[in-house]
Amino acid sequence: MPRKRLRAVLFGPQGSGKGTQGRMLADYFGVPLIGSGELFRAEIQEKTALGKLVKSYVGRGALVPDELVNAVVQKQLKAIAVDRGFLLDGYPRNVEQAESLDKVVKINLALQIKIGDDESLRRLLGRRQCTGCKTIFHI
């Protein structure tokens, strides 16, 4: 019987370490880590139709609507071999997004990282980004 591949979602508040833990889990299981933020940046940089729509919201500091978030994530899921597995970082964020995802692929694991509000705030206040290379680091 073939081994079931990881098709998982990773949840947690900002500063909880989703990105760090997600990279380690994705490496361990040999699956791609898919984060909506990275997908948004790629779509914007490539100047796709979706990217232009995303930029219109991100540029003014507005939340990207669920329909658009779903379209960006589903585009990526269609581009990879989902039967080989994947790990979604921070998506879905609500019931509408979860229902949309469920129509495309079945998730077999959900992981939640819990962290206190004070610790989350401490970590976020210590987060910095290099203006040149865009690397995020902590002080």
Model-predicted regions and their roles:
Residues 1-139:
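Glycine-rich phosphate-binding loop of ATP-dependent small-molecule kinases
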